[in-house]
């Protein structure tokens, strides 16, 4: 087969405008496939997605998913090495492209004119599902509206692409038939060109760099253009699309009515924490919809004194989402806000909308009085006394261990969960990555049980959205046999443990590959950290202070972080470190700069590390409940008490949560996916 025959084959099989088809039947097929596309789209969004979210919570389905992710598609498999496996964006792109391509091409019989008409009609048919995905909160069960935004973005991209192709092919069809000038003078076609221009404007401003440059411009263009597109498409489409327009208007107006219903005005108090963080407070009674679960969020808008500006803010609700850092029963609602573009003025009025509940499937509020005699609680560490059961901190927790990673102001998501999970006897670890050690001052404004909290101070400059957590995805065959794990305890000493020691009696034993080897062969290190020499650490003094003067001076913070030469004084010696309140001395600053607080007090139970954490086998061992006490001579305690049972049954009670910057959430999600664990991420970044 030569090149000429290949070209001729394509010419014969490619769609063409020369196909002779009855105009009436062509119109019927275009309407038929667009309606089927609309119906199936709503079935996928309203039935299949919630059903999948529900099935993931069942033990049987979790075991299947765990086996596939942790064993079949582990790091040795070729599937794991592909970008498609890890990138949700690529998966959605492929699914949306195949889905729409089927309805565009199926049954067209090579008629390019019918395909062109279908592109326009299907892009209109996808508008109601596209707008439905933006509803806040989502009416779908077991579904957080933030989790639907990636699907919303890819459907919108497909709609824009089909609109462009629809316009281009129609212009070409008019040109070859010498009707371009005549057709383009008709008003409906002009409306179509204007709608395409608005689609392109939305696409350009939706690029990530444009969004980060000016989110306000992106939002205004997005909101106004959406309404205008609905109007222009209504008058452009032939035959009419009254039912599509009705659905679109109902969705948008319903969202407006609900937003106004849960919006109120409050007067806030601003408490400065550091140069980068502030605490916003207002009474719980001013919140229109009281929160039920911890980790919810609300949306805030400025209350303008000018009536016209207030009307405009209701017309185009440019709101900022913030996670509620206080627990639902507190009298004050507290928000930890990163100082930036959002203006913060104490004793001023703001519009507040919400609260919006999180989608944490393992936690719920008891709806009926708890009977002490029943065995509804599977947690053996839970105190079922009547006084604690009647506490506002009492929740039904369907998890035994919760591992959380947050970055920057994402600590708002972790603090209320940490307090409630600790109260209900759940083993919990909270890793907070922060750039500035002064942000630790925010902990003193919250009444909390900080057991299980670890703070990693990167000491680097930049935007909060650039905060990351490391997950090095590689496989070393030698590590399966003898893997040395380096970790830093609260006393600053380095403990090295091999994988074999976890299940041994003290004598070396040959290791056989097991179902946990894939993740337990990874190294858990603290990036850019060199443990200090013991001789360099002086004895702990009576003041029990932590001095960061040489660790994070302004002139050396970037250099020291890169070389891992951070230094501590009188803070990493003795097992009692971080078990009592600590006092941090800030680094020396330039005299010209504003004076910083003399000392920063850290609550008891908090562990502080330097650098950036790396997720690995030590963290997975913690999820498996196989971590060892480094100070215990005998390693008999390292045996997993229930090693005979199916470990997937236990891991179904383990959850991994992440909140904050996109990079941190993606790394945590990949680590949790490779381990076959439940994962929930929450990010307001678009």
From Swiss-Prot:
Localization per record: Membrane
Transmembrane feature ranges: 36-56, 90-110, 129-149, 158-178, 187-207, 217-237, 268-288, 403-423
Taxonomy, superkingdom: Eukaryota
Ferric oxidoreductase domain residues: 119-666
Ranges in the topological domain labelled Cytoplasmic: 1-35, 111-128, 179-186, 238-267, 424-686
Key words, A-Z: Electron transport, FAD, Flavoprotein, Glycoprotein, Ion transport, Iron, Iron transport, Membrane, NAD, Oxidoreductase, Transmembrane, Transmembrane helix, Transport
Topological relation to the membrane, as annotated: Multi-pass membrane protein
Cofactor: FAD
Protein's name according to its UniProt entry: Probable ferric reductase transmembrane component 8
Species of origin: Saccharomyces cerevisiae (strain ATCC 204508 / S288c) (Baker's yeast)
Gene: FRE8
């Amino acid at each position: 087969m030569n090149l000429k025959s290949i070209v001729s084959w394509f010419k014969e099989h490619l769609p063409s405008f020369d196909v002779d088809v009855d105009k009436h039947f062509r119109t019927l097929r275009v309407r038929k496939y667009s309606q089927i596309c609309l119906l199936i789209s709503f079935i996928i969004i309203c039935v299949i997605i919630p059903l999948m979210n529900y099935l993931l919570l069942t033990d049987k389905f979790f075991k299947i998913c765990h086996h596939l992710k942790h064993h079949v598609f582990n790091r040795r498999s070729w599937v794991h090495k592909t970008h498609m496996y890890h990138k949700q964006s690529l998966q959605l792109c492929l699914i949306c492209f195949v889905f729409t391509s089927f309805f565009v091409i199926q049954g067209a019989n090579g008629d390019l004119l019918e395909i062109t008409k279908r592109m326009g009609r299907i892009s209109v048919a996808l508008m109601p599902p596209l707008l439905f995905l933006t509803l806040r909160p989502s009416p779908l069960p077991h579904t957080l509206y933030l989790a639907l935004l990636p699907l919303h973005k890819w459907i919108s991209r497909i709609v824009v692409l089909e609109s462009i192709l629809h316009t281009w092919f129609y212009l070409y069809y008019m040109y070859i038939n010498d009707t371009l000038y005549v057709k383009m003078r008709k008003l409906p076609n002009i409306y179509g060109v204007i709608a395409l221009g608005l689609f392109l404007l939305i696409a350009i401003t939706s690029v990530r760099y444009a969004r980060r440059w000016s989110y306000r411009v992106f939002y205004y263009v997005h909101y106004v253009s959406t309404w205008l597109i609905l109007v222009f498409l209504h008058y452009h489409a032939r035959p009419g699309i009254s039912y599509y327009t009705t659905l679109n208007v109902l969705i948008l107006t319903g969202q407006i009515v609900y937003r106004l219903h849960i919006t109120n005005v409050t007067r806030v108090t601003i408490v400065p924490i550091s140069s980068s963080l502030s605490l916003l407070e207002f009474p719980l009674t001013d919140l229109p919809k009281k929160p039920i679960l911890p980790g919810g969020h609300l949306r805030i808008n400025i209350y303008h004194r000018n009536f016209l500006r207030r009307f405009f803010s209701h017309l185009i609700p440019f709101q900022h989402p913030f996670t509620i850092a206080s627990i639902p029963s507190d009298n004050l609602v507290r928000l930890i806000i990163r100082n930036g573009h959002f203006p913060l003025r104490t004793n001023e009025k703001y519009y507040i909308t919400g609260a919006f509940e999180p989608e944490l499937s393992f936690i719920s509020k008891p709806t009926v009085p708890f009977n002490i005699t029943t065995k509804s609680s599977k947690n053996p560490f839970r105190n079922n006394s009547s006084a604690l059961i009647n506490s506002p901190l009492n929740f039904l927790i369907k998890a035994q261990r919760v591992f959380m990673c947050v970055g920057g102001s994402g600590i708002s998501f972790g603090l209320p969960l940490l307090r409630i999970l600790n109260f209900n006897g759940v083993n919990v670890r909270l890793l907070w990555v922060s750039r500035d050690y002064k942000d630790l001052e925010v902990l003193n404004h919250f009444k909390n049980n900080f057991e299980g909290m670890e703070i990693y101070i990167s000491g680097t400059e930049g935007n909060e959205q650039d905060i990351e957590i490391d997950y090095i995805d590689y496989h070393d065959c030698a590590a399966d046999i003898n893997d040395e794990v380096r970790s830093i305890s609260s006393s600053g000493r380095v403990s090295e443990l091999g994988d074999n020691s976890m299940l041994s009696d003290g004598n070396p034993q040959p290791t056989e590959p097991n179902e946990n080897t894939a993740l337990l062969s990874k190294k858990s290190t603290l990036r850019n950290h060199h443990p200090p020499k013991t001789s360099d650490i002086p004895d702990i003094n009576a003041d029990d202070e932590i001095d960061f003067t040489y660790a994070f001076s302004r002139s050396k913070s970037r250099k020291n972080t890169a070389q891992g030469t951070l230094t501590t004084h009188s803070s990493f010696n003795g097992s009692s470190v971080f078990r009592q309140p600590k006092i941090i001395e800030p680094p020396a600053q330039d005299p010209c700069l504003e004076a910083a607080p003399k000392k920063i007090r850290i609550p008891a139970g908090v562990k502080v590390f330097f650098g950036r954490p790396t997720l690995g086998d030590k963290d997975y061992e913690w999820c498996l409940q196989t971590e060892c006490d480094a100070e215990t001579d005998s390693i008999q305690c390292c045996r997993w008490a229930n090693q005979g049972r199916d470990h997937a049954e236990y891991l179904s009670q383990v959850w991994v949560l992440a909140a904050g910057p996109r990079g941190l959430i993606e790394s945590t999600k990949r680590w949790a996916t490779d381990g076959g664990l439940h994962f929930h991420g929450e990010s307001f970044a678009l």
